Amino acid sequence: MANPTSMSSAVHVYRRFVPQPVRSAAATTVPAGVRRKVKGGLARTLSRREARLHRRALRRVRRAGLGQSERRTTAPDGRIAHVHTGLTVDLARRLDHDLVTHALDAAEVPWFAVPALDDRRLCLAVEVRDKGTVRRVLRALLEEHTGYVVSVSPSAADTRETPGSHIKAWKHYGRARVIRLTWLRTDPTEGLWVGEDQGIEIEFWTANTDLPHERLIGPRPNRVQRAVPAEALGIEIGLDRLSGYCDIDGDLGPTVTLENFDVVRLEEISFPVDAVLLWQHPTPWGEELLRAALRSVHQYAPWIDVVHVVAQAEPPAWLEADERISVVRAVPGAEWRLDQLPDLAEHFLLMRPGALLGRPVRPFDYFTPGGGTRPRRGPWNASESFAEWVRAAYSVTGRATGHGYAAGPQPYRADTLTRLGEAGARSLPVPDEQVLSGVPGTHPMDGMAHHFGYVAGHADPSGEASVALHAALPGIGTHLQRLLVRRDVQQLQFFGLGTGEAGSGGGTNAVVRFLHQYYPVPSVFECDRPQTDTEPDRHS
Protein backbone atom coordinates (compact mmCIF):
# COMPACT_ATOMS: atom_id res chain seq x y z
CA MET A 1 0.00 0.00 0.00
CA ALA A 2 1.22 3.53 -0.72
CA ASN A 3 2.59 5.48 2.21
CA PRO A 4 0.31 8.08 3.84
CA THR A 5 2.26 11.00 2.43
CA SER A 6 1.88 9.70 -1.11
CA MET A 7 -1.80 9.02 -0.54
CA SER A 8 -2.27 12.56 0.70
CA SER A 9 -0.58 13.83 -2.47
CA ALA A 10 -2.81 11.60 -4.55
CA VAL A 11 -5.92 12.90 -2.85
CA HIS A 12 -4.72 16.46 -3.42
CA VAL A 13 -4.16 15.82 -7.14
CA TYR A 14 -7.50 13.99 -7.37
CA ARG A 15 -9.37 16.92 -5.84
CA ARG A 16 -7.49 19.42 -7.98
CA PHE A 17 -8.20 17.86 -11.36
CA VAL A 18 -11.58 16.18 -10.79
CA PRO A 19 -14.40 18.73 -10.33
CA GLN A 20 -16.56 18.51 -7.25
CA PRO A 21 -19.77 17.47 -9.14
CA VAL A 22 -17.89 14.62 -10.81
CA ARG A 23 -16.47 13.50 -7.46
CA SER A 24 -19.95 13.59 -5.91
CA ALA A 25 -21.39 11.52 -8.75
CA ALA A 26 -18.52 9.04 -8.53
CA ALA A 27 -19.06 8.66 -4.80
CA THR A 28 -22.62 7.42 -5.41
CA THR A 29 -22.23 5.48 -8.66
CA VAL A 30 -18.69 4.04 -8.64
CA PRO A 31 -18.04 1.15 -6.22
CA ALA A 32 -15.79 1.95 -3.26
CA GLY A 33 -13.27 -0.70 -4.29
CA VAL A 34 -12.83 0.84 -7.71
CA ARG A 35 -12.35 4.30 -6.20
CA ARG A 36 -9.69 2.98 -3.81
CA LYS A 37 -7.94 1.22 -6.69
CA VAL A 38 -7.84 4.41 -8.79
CA LYS A 39 -6.55 6.50 -5.89
CA GLY A 40 -3.97 3.86 -4.98
CA GLY A 41 -2.68 3.76 -8.56
CA LEU A 42 -2.44 7.53 -8.60
CA ALA A 43 -0.52 7.44 -5.31
CA ARG A 44 1.93 4.85 -6.67
CA THR A 45 2.47 6.89 -9.82
CA LEU A 46 3.21 10.02 -7.81
CA SER A 47 5.49 8.08 -5.47
CA ARG A 48 7.52 6.67 -8.37
CA ARG A 49 7.77 10.14 -9.95
CA GLU A 50 8.91 11.64 -6.64
CA ALA A 51 11.54 8.93 -6.18
CA ARG A 52 12.85 9.48 -9.72
CA LEU A 53 13.09 13.25 -9.26
CA HIS A 54 14.74 12.78 -5.85
CA ARG A 55 17.42 10.52 -7.33
CA ARG A 56 18.08 13.10 -10.04
CA ALA A 57 18.43 15.88 -7.45
CA LEU A 58 20.69 13.68 -5.33
CA ARG A 59 23.00 13.08 -8.30
CA ARG A 60 23.22 16.85 -8.84
CA VAL A 61 24.13 17.44 -5.20
CA ARG A 62 26.78 14.72 -5.22
CA ARG A 63 28.31 15.95 -8.47
CA ALA A 64 28.61 19.39 -6.87
CA GLY A 65 30.60 17.85 -3.98
CA LEU A 66 28.33 19.26 -1.29
CA GLY A 67 28.10 18.05 2.28
CA GLN A 68 31.55 17.40 3.74
CA SER A 69 32.41 16.91 7.41
CA GLU A 70 35.03 14.90 9.26
CA ARG A 71 32.53 12.49 10.74
CA ARG A 72 29.03 12.28 12.14
CA THR A 73 28.00 11.93 15.77
CA THR A 74 24.82 11.80 17.80
CA ALA A 75 23.73 14.90 19.68
CA PRO A 76 22.41 14.63 23.27
CA ASP A 77 18.82 14.84 21.96
CA GLY A 78 19.38 11.97 19.52
CA ARG A 79 19.74 14.01 16.34
CA ILE A 80 22.64 13.69 13.92
CA ALA A 81 25.45 16.26 14.13
CA HIS A 82 28.59 16.89 12.09
CA VAL A 83 32.09 17.17 13.56
CA HIS A 84 34.45 19.95 12.40
CA THR A 85 37.90 20.74 13.75
CA GLY A 86 38.28 24.43 14.57
CA LEU A 87 34.53 24.99 14.58
CA THR A 88 33.24 28.48 15.34
CA VAL A 89 29.75 29.92 15.29
CA ASP A 90 30.63 32.07 12.28
CA LEU A 91 32.19 29.14 10.42
CA ALA A 92 29.02 27.09 10.94
CA ARG A 93 26.92 29.96 9.61
CA ARG A 94 29.06 30.22 6.48
CA LEU A 95 29.04 26.44 5.95
CA ASP A 96 25.24 26.45 6.06
CA HIS A 97 25.07 29.37 3.64
CA ASP A 98 27.46 27.79 1.16
CA LEU A 99 25.67 24.43 1.30
CA VAL A 100 22.28 25.89 0.46
CA THR A 101 23.43 28.38 -2.17
CA HIS A 102 25.58 25.82 -3.99
CA ALA A 103 22.67 23.36 -3.98
CA LEU A 104 20.34 25.99 -5.46
CA ASP A 105 22.97 26.86 -8.06
CA ALA A 106 23.32 23.18 -8.97
CA ALA A 107 19.56 23.03 -9.53
CA GLU A 108 19.69 26.32 -11.50
CA VAL A 109 17.29 28.03 -9.09
CA PRO A 110 17.71 31.84 -8.95
CA TRP A 111 18.08 33.22 -5.43
CA PHE A 112 19.15 36.34 -3.55
CA ALA A 113 19.91 37.09 0.10
CA VAL A 114 17.64 39.33 2.16
CA PRO A 115 18.12 40.75 5.67
CA ALA A 116 16.71 38.21 8.14
CA LEU A 117 14.45 39.17 11.02
CA ASP A 118 17.04 37.70 13.41
CA ASP A 119 20.74 38.49 13.01
CA ARG A 120 21.65 34.97 14.14
CA ARG A 121 20.30 33.57 10.87
CA LEU A 122 20.81 34.19 7.18
CA CYS A 123 17.85 34.39 4.82
CA LEU A 124 17.56 33.58 1.11
CA ALA A 125 14.70 34.40 -1.23
CA VAL A 126 13.47 32.30 -4.17
CA GLU A 127 10.41 32.68 -6.35
CA VAL A 128 7.39 30.62 -5.41
CA ARG A 129 7.22 29.17 -8.93
CA ASP A 130 10.48 27.29 -8.15
CA LYS A 131 9.07 25.79 -4.96
CA GLY A 132 8.92 22.24 -6.31
CA THR A 133 12.52 22.28 -7.55
CA VAL A 134 13.68 23.85 -4.29
CA ARG A 135 12.09 21.08 -2.22
CA ARG A 136 13.67 18.33 -4.28
CA VAL A 137 17.19 19.75 -4.25
CA LEU A 138 17.06 20.64 -0.55
CA ARG A 139 15.75 17.21 0.38
CA ALA A 140 18.64 15.69 -1.58
CA LEU A 141 21.05 18.04 0.19
CA LEU A 142 19.70 17.02 3.59
CA GLU A 143 20.17 13.36 2.66
CA GLU A 144 23.76 13.95 1.57
CA HIS A 145 24.56 16.12 4.61
CA THR A 146 22.07 15.24 7.33
CA GLY A 147 20.09 18.23 8.53
CA TYR A 148 16.59 19.26 9.53
CA VAL A 149 13.78 21.42 8.17
CA VAL A 150 10.88 23.20 9.85
CA SER A 151 8.18 25.56 8.66
CA VAL A 152 8.65 29.09 10.01
CA SER A 153 5.58 30.73 8.47
CA PRO A 154 3.15 29.33 9.37
CA SER A 155 5.00 28.05 12.40
CA ALA A 156 5.20 24.25 12.68
CA ALA A 157 8.18 22.82 14.56
CA ASP A 158 6.95 19.23 14.95
CA THR A 159 9.45 18.08 12.28
CA ARG A 160 12.56 19.48 14.02
CA GLU A 161 13.76 15.99 15.02
CA THR A 162 12.93 14.31 11.70
CA PRO A 163 15.88 14.18 9.27
CA GLY A 164 15.18 16.32 6.24
CA SER A 165 15.83 13.39 3.90
CA HIS A 166 12.56 11.81 5.11
CA ILE A 167 9.58 12.89 3.04
CA LYS A 168 7.45 13.26 6.17
CA ALA A 169 9.75 16.10 7.27
CA TRP A 170 8.24 18.10 4.40
CA LYS A 171 4.58 17.59 5.30
CA HIS A 172 4.09 21.33 5.97
CA TYR A 173 6.00 22.44 2.90
CA GLY A 174 2.96 22.87 0.66
CA ARG A 175 1.54 25.77 2.65
CA ALA A 176 4.85 27.08 4.02
CA ARG A 177 5.81 30.62 3.06
CA VAL A 178 9.12 30.47 4.95
CA ILE A 179 11.15 27.40 5.93
CA ARG A 180 14.33 26.98 7.97
CA LEU A 181 17.14 24.49 7.39
CA THR A 182 19.42 23.64 10.30
CA TRP A 183 22.51 21.50 10.71
CA LEU A 184 23.90 20.55 14.10
CA ARG A 185 27.67 20.89 14.29
CA THR A 186 30.22 20.24 17.02
CA ASP A 187 33.97 20.20 17.59
CA PRO A 188 35.94 16.93 18.05
CA THR A 189 35.56 17.12 21.86
CA GLU A 190 31.77 17.46 21.45
CA GLY A 191 31.86 20.24 24.02
CA LEU A 192 30.62 23.00 21.70
CA TRP A 193 27.30 22.53 19.89
CA VAL A 194 26.25 24.97 17.18
CA GLY A 195 23.24 25.21 14.91
CA GLU A 196 20.11 24.98 17.02
CA ASP A 197 19.47 28.74 17.04
CA GLN A 198 21.01 29.43 13.62
CA GLY A 199 20.20 27.96 10.23
CA ILE A 200 19.24 29.25 6.80
CA GLU A 201 15.74 30.57 6.24
CA ILE A 202 14.23 30.45 2.75
CA GLU A 203 11.41 32.81 1.80
CA PHE A 204 9.15 32.17 -1.19
CA TRP A 205 8.55 35.44 -3.02
CA THR A 206 5.64 35.90 -5.43
CA ALA A 207 5.49 37.89 -8.66
CA ASN A 208 3.04 40.80 -8.64
CA THR A 209 1.78 42.62 -11.76
CA ASP A 210 -0.70 45.04 -10.19
CA LEU A 211 1.57 47.93 -11.17
CA PRO A 212 2.97 48.64 -14.65
CA HIS A 213 6.32 47.19 -13.59
CA GLU A 214 6.44 43.64 -12.25
CA ARG A 215 7.48 43.33 -8.62
CA LEU A 216 8.51 40.54 -6.27
CA ILE A 217 6.64 40.50 -2.96
CA GLY A 218 8.09 38.86 0.12
CA PRO A 219 5.97 36.60 2.36
CA ARG A 220 6.79 38.65 5.47
CA PRO A 221 8.28 42.04 6.38
CA ASN A 222 12.04 42.40 6.72
CA ARG A 223 14.31 45.17 7.98
CA VAL A 224 14.61 46.91 4.61
CA GLN A 225 11.66 46.43 2.24
CA ARG A 226 9.15 43.77 1.34
CA ALA A 227 8.65 44.57 -2.37
CA VAL A 228 11.41 44.91 -4.98
CA PRO A 229 11.36 45.40 -8.76
CA ALA A 230 11.55 42.10 -10.61
CA GLU A 231 14.34 43.49 -12.80
CA ALA A 232 16.46 44.73 -9.86
CA LEU A 233 20.18 44.18 -10.33
CA GLY A 234 22.02 41.59 -8.27
CA ILE A 235 25.20 42.60 -6.45
CA GLU A 236 27.76 40.94 -4.20
CA ILE A 237 27.69 41.84 -0.52
CA GLY A 238 29.60 40.63 2.53
CA LEU A 239 27.75 38.51 5.06
CA ASP A 240 28.72 41.02 7.75
CA ARG A 241 26.38 43.49 6.03
CA LEU A 242 23.48 41.09 6.60
CA SER A 243 24.36 39.84 10.09
CA GLY A 244 26.19 41.69 12.85
CA TYR A 245 27.60 38.41 14.18
CA CYS A 246 29.73 37.72 11.08
CA ASP A 247 33.46 38.15 10.55
CA ILE A 248 34.44 41.40 8.85
CA ASP A 249 37.37 39.81 7.00
CA GLY A 250 37.17 41.08 3.43
CA ASP A 251 38.89 37.95 2.09
CA LEU A 252 35.89 35.79 2.98
CA GLY A 253 33.45 34.94 0.22
CA PRO A 254 30.48 37.29 -0.31
CA THR A 255 26.88 36.45 -1.02
CA VAL A 256 24.47 37.84 -3.63
CA THR A 257 21.62 40.22 -2.96
CA LEU A 258 19.63 42.84 -4.86
CA GLU A 259 20.86 46.42 -4.99
CA ASN A 260 17.73 47.47 -3.08
CA PHE A 261 19.02 45.68 0.03
CA ASP A 262 22.46 47.31 -0.03
CA VAL A 263 21.57 49.88 2.62
CA VAL A 264 23.06 50.57 6.04
CA ARG A 265 20.93 48.94 8.72
CA LEU A 266 19.92 50.86 11.84
CA GLU A 267 22.14 48.75 14.12
CA GLU A 268 25.06 48.40 11.69
CA ILE A 269 28.46 49.46 13.04
CA SER A 270 30.77 50.78 10.33
CA PHE A 271 33.88 51.60 12.39
CA PRO A 272 36.60 49.10 13.45
CA VAL A 273 36.62 47.72 16.99
CA ASP A 274 39.74 46.34 18.70
CA ALA A 275 40.10 44.27 21.87
CA VAL A 276 42.57 45.00 24.68
CA LEU A 277 43.45 42.11 27.01
CA LEU A 278 45.43 42.65 30.20
CA TRP A 279 48.03 40.01 31.11
CA GLN A 280 49.01 40.27 34.79
CA HIS A 281 49.40 36.83 36.38
CA PRO A 282 52.25 34.58 35.11
CA THR A 283 50.72 31.50 36.76
CA PRO A 284 49.04 28.39 35.33
CA TRP A 285 45.56 29.70 36.15
CA GLY A 286 46.54 33.14 34.83
CA GLU A 287 47.52 31.62 31.49
CA GLU A 288 44.20 29.75 31.37
CA LEU A 289 42.30 33.01 31.91
CA LEU A 290 44.21 34.65 29.05
CA ARG A 291 43.76 31.63 26.80
CA ALA A 292 40.01 31.55 27.53
CA ALA A 293 39.67 35.29 26.82
CA LEU A 294 41.37 34.86 23.44
CA ARG A 295 39.17 31.89 22.63
CA SER A 296 36.02 33.77 23.59
CA VAL A 297 36.96 36.61 21.24
CA HIS A 298 37.80 34.16 18.46
CA GLN A 299 34.59 32.19 18.96
CA TYR A 300 32.00 34.82 19.77
CA ALA A 301 33.32 38.15 18.39
CA PRO A 302 34.89 37.46 14.96
CA TRP A 303 34.29 41.11 14.05
CA ILE A 304 37.12 42.22 16.37
CA ASP A 305 39.82 43.77 14.19
CA VAL A 306 43.06 43.57 16.23
CA VAL A 307 43.72 42.08 19.68
CA HIS A 308 46.17 44.05 21.84
CA VAL A 309 47.70 42.15 24.78
CA VAL A 310 49.02 44.60 27.38
CA ALA A 311 51.55 42.45 29.24
CA GLN A 312 52.51 43.49 32.76
CA ALA A 313 54.51 40.25 33.04
CA GLU A 314 56.44 38.02 30.65
CA PRO A 315 53.96 36.94 27.91
CA PRO A 316 53.25 33.21 27.58
CA ALA A 317 55.35 31.39 25.01
CA TRP A 318 52.26 30.04 23.25
CA LEU A 319 51.04 33.46 22.04
CA GLU A 320 51.05 33.27 18.24
CA ALA A 321 52.63 36.14 16.31
CA ASP A 322 49.97 37.30 13.88
CA GLU A 323 48.83 40.45 12.14
CA ARG A 324 45.67 40.36 14.24
CA ILE A 325 47.47 40.36 17.61
CA SER A 326 49.82 42.90 19.18
CA VAL A 327 51.75 42.32 22.42
CA VAL A 328 52.90 45.44 24.30
CA ARG A 329 54.94 45.38 27.52
CA ALA A 330 53.66 47.73 30.23
CA VAL A 331 53.98 48.52 33.92
CA PRO A 332 51.21 48.01 36.52
CA GLY A 333 48.57 50.72 36.33
CA ALA A 334 49.09 51.27 32.60
CA GLU A 335 45.41 50.65 31.86
CA TRP A 336 44.68 54.29 32.71
CA ARG A 337 46.76 55.21 29.64
CA LEU A 338 45.41 52.73 27.10
CA ASP A 339 44.66 55.59 24.72
CA GLN A 340 48.43 55.76 24.14
CA LEU A 341 48.64 52.21 22.75
CA PRO A 342 50.15 52.27 19.26
CA ASP A 343 47.70 51.61 16.42
CA LEU A 344 44.76 51.18 18.80
CA ALA A 345 41.35 51.74 17.22
CA GLU A 346 39.22 54.56 18.56
CA HIS A 347 36.71 52.00 19.88
CA PHE A 348 37.80 48.89 21.78
CA LEU A 349 36.70 46.25 24.27
CA LEU A 350 38.76 46.09 27.47
CA MET A 351 39.01 42.61 28.97
CA ARG A 352 40.74 42.32 32.31
CA PRO A 353 41.85 38.94 33.70
CA GLY A 354 38.72 36.81 34.16
CA ALA A 355 36.54 38.78 31.70
CA LEU A 356 35.01 36.56 29.01
CA LEU A 357 32.35 36.55 26.31
CA GLY A 358 29.75 33.86 27.00
CA ARG A 359 27.82 33.76 23.72
CA PRO A 360 27.90 35.39 20.27
CA VAL A 361 27.84 39.18 20.40
CA ARG A 362 27.58 41.98 17.84
CA PRO A 363 29.38 45.33 17.81
CA PHE A 364 25.94 46.85 18.43
CA ASP A 365 25.83 45.06 21.79
CA TYR A 366 28.67 47.30 22.99
CA PHE A 367 28.60 50.38 20.75
CA THR A 368 26.02 52.63 19.11
CA PRO A 369 26.13 53.42 15.38
CA GLY A 370 27.07 57.00 16.29
CA GLY A 371 30.20 55.84 18.13
CA GLY A 372 28.92 55.84 21.71
CA THR A 373 29.60 53.05 24.19
CA ARG A 374 27.01 50.79 25.83
CA PRO A 375 28.44 49.70 29.21
CA ARG A 376 26.44 47.36 31.46
CA ARG A 377 24.70 48.71 34.53
CA GLY A 378 25.79 47.09 37.79
CA PRO A 379 24.53 46.81 41.37
CA TRP A 380 24.09 49.96 43.45
CA ASN A 381 24.08 49.94 47.24
CA ALA A 382 25.21 52.03 50.19
CA SER A 383 28.82 50.83 50.14
CA GLU A 384 29.06 51.43 46.40
CA SER A 385 27.74 54.97 46.76
CA PHE A 386 30.65 55.80 49.11
CA ALA A 387 33.33 54.32 46.80
CA GLU A 388 36.29 56.49 45.91
CA TRP A 389 35.47 56.45 42.21
CA VAL A 390 32.03 57.97 42.89
CA ARG A 391 33.60 61.02 44.53
CA ALA A 392 36.25 61.30 41.84
CA ALA A 393 33.66 61.08 39.05
CA TYR A 394 31.59 63.80 40.69
CA SER A 395 34.60 66.09 41.06
CA VAL A 396 35.42 65.75 37.35
CA THR A 397 31.91 66.06 35.90
CA GLY A 398 29.97 67.92 38.56
CA ARG A 399 27.22 65.30 38.20
CA ALA A 400 26.42 62.57 40.71
CA THR A 401 26.09 58.98 39.54
CA GLY A 402 23.13 56.79 40.42
CA HIS A 403 24.31 53.31 39.48
CA GLY A 404 27.41 51.17 39.19
CA TYR A 405 28.79 49.23 36.25
CA ALA A 406 28.89 45.46 35.89
CA ALA A 407 32.14 43.54 35.55
CA GLY A 408 33.14 41.80 32.33
CA PRO A 409 34.25 43.08 28.91
CA GLN A 410 34.04 46.88 28.87
CA PRO A 411 33.40 49.10 25.81
CA TYR A 412 35.75 52.09 25.64
CA ARG A 413 36.51 55.07 23.45
CA ALA A 414 40.14 56.13 23.34
CA ASP A 415 39.21 59.80 23.23
CA THR A 416 37.22 59.41 26.47
CA LEU A 417 40.39 58.38 28.29
CA THR A 418 42.27 61.25 26.64
CA ARG A 419 39.65 63.82 27.61
CA LEU A 420 39.44 62.34 31.11
CA GLY A 421 43.16 62.97 31.56
CA GLU A 422 42.86 66.48 30.13
CA ALA A 423 40.09 67.21 32.64
CA GLY A 424 42.56 66.63 35.47
CA ALA A 425 41.18 63.30 36.69
CA ARG A 426 43.70 61.46 38.82
CA SER A 427 44.46 57.78 38.33
CA LEU A 428 42.79 55.88 41.16
CA PRO A 429 44.44 52.80 42.69
CA VAL A 430 43.53 49.70 40.69
CA PRO A 431 43.00 46.52 42.76
CA ASP A 432 44.19 43.09 41.68
CA GLU A 433 40.77 41.46 41.44
CA GLN A 434 42.17 37.91 41.37
CA VAL A 435 43.45 38.14 44.95
CA LEU A 436 40.41 39.84 46.52
CA SER A 437 38.46 37.80 49.07
CA GLY A 438 35.07 38.68 47.58
CA VAL A 439 33.36 39.96 44.44
CA PRO A 440 34.24 43.67 44.20
CA GLY A 441 31.95 46.46 43.12
CA THR A 442 32.45 48.72 40.14
CA HIS A 443 36.03 48.87 38.90
CA PRO A 444 37.35 52.41 39.59
CA MET A 445 38.47 52.97 36.00
CA ASP A 446 35.17 51.73 34.56
CA GLY A 447 33.16 53.89 36.92
CA MET A 448 35.17 57.01 36.13
CA ALA A 449 35.33 56.55 32.35
CA HIS A 450 31.74 55.39 31.82
CA HIS A 451 30.28 58.15 34.00
CA PHE A 452 32.43 60.74 32.24
CA GLY A 453 31.25 59.44 28.86
CA TYR A 454 27.63 59.30 30.04
CA VAL A 455 27.68 62.94 31.10
CA ALA A 456 29.30 63.92 27.79
CA GLY A 457 26.67 62.00 25.80
CA HIS A 458 29.15 59.36 24.60
CA ALA A 459 27.86 56.44 26.68
CA ASP A 460 24.44 54.80 26.91
CA PRO A 461 24.36 52.27 29.79
CA SER A 462 22.37 49.11 29.06
CA GLY A 463 21.34 46.07 31.07
CA GLU A 464 22.34 42.87 29.24
CA ALA A 465 22.78 39.77 31.39
CA SER A 466 26.22 39.26 32.93
CA VAL A 467 27.51 36.95 35.65
CA ALA A 468 30.31 37.53 38.17
CA LEU A 469 31.61 34.59 40.25
CA HIS A 470 34.31 34.29 42.90
CA ALA A 471 36.41 31.14 42.72
CA ALA A 472 36.08 30.58 46.48
CA LEU A 473 32.26 30.51 46.32
CA PRO A 474 30.95 27.40 48.14
CA GLY A 475 29.36 24.99 45.68
CA ILE A 476 30.76 26.85 42.69
CA GLY A 477 30.69 23.63 40.69
CA THR A 478 26.88 23.75 40.53
CA HIS A 479 26.92 27.29 39.19
CA LEU A 480 29.55 26.43 36.61
CA GLN A 481 27.62 23.39 35.44
CA ARG A 482 24.50 25.51 35.00
CA LEU A 483 26.46 28.02 32.91
CA LEU A 484 27.92 25.20 30.84
CA VAL A 485 24.51 23.72 30.06
CA ARG A 486 22.65 26.95 29.37
CA ARG A 487 25.33 29.03 27.60
CA ASP A 488 22.96 31.99 27.59
CA VAL A 489 25.00 34.65 29.44
CA GLN A 490 26.46 37.37 27.27
CA GLN A 491 29.49 38.07 29.45
CA LEU A 492 31.28 36.41 32.38
CA GLN A 493 33.73 37.62 35.00
CA PHE A 494 35.70 35.40 37.38
CA PHE A 495 37.38 36.77 40.50
CA GLY A 496 39.64 35.38 43.20
CA LEU A 497 41.48 32.61 41.38
CA GLY A 498 44.66 33.63 43.20
CA THR A 499 43.22 33.50 46.73
CA GLY A 500 44.22 30.82 49.20
CA GLU A 501 40.58 29.86 49.80
CA ALA A 502 40.00 29.17 46.10
CA GLY A 503 43.22 27.18 45.82
CA SER A 504 42.68 25.00 48.89
CA GLY A 505 38.95 24.60 48.31
CA GLY A 506 39.28 23.47 44.71
CA GLY A 507 37.57 26.53 43.26
CA THR A 508 40.50 27.53 41.08
CA ASN A 509 40.75 24.05 39.57
CA ALA A 510 36.97 23.99 39.04
CA VAL A 511 37.09 27.26 37.11
CA VAL A 512 40.00 26.04 34.97
CA ARG A 513 38.12 22.83 34.13
CA PHE A 514 35.07 24.91 33.26
CA LEU A 515 37.11 27.08 30.91
CA HIS A 516 38.42 24.00 29.11
CA GLN A 517 34.86 22.75 28.61
CA TYR A 518 33.25 26.08 27.74
CA TYR A 519 35.95 27.06 25.23
CA PRO A 520 37.19 23.78 23.70
CA VAL A 521 38.12 25.24 20.31
CA PRO A 522 41.64 26.78 20.15
CA SER A 523 41.93 30.31 18.83
CA VAL A 524 44.12 31.51 15.99
CA PHE A 525 46.22 33.33 18.59
CA GLU A 526 47.64 30.08 20.10
CA CYS A 527 50.70 28.51 18.51
CA ASP A 528 50.32 25.33 20.58
CA ARG A 529 46.75 24.62 19.49
CA PRO A 530 46.28 20.93 18.64
CA GLN A 531 45.87 19.86 15.05
CA THR A 532 43.54 17.00 14.11
CA ASP A 533 44.08 15.14 10.85
CA THR A 534 40.96 13.27 9.81
CA GLU A 535 39.68 12.04 6.49
CA PRO A 536 36.49 13.94 5.61
CA ASP A 537 33.35 11.89 5.17
CA ARG A 538 31.85 12.99 1.86
CA HIS A 539 28.63 11.05 2.36
CA SER A 540 27.52 12.23 5.81
Swiss-Prot record:
GO terms for molecular function: transferase activity, transferring phosphorus-containing groups. Keywords: Exopolysaccharide synthesis, Transferase. InterPro entries: Stealth (IPR047141), Stealth_CR2 (IPR021520). GO terms for biological process: polysaccharide biosynthetic process. Its EC number is 2.7.-.-. It comes from the Bacteria. Belongs to the stealth family. Stealth proteins are part of a protein family that is conserved from bacteria to higher eukaryotes. Family members were first identified in microbes as proteins that help pathogens to elude the host innate immune system. Microbial stealth proteins are involved in the biosynthesis of exopolysaccharides. Stealth proteins are predicted to function as hexose-1-phosphoryltransferases. This is Exopolysaccharide phosphotransferase SCO6022. It comes from Streptomyces coelicolor (strain ATCC BAA-471 / A3(2) / M145).
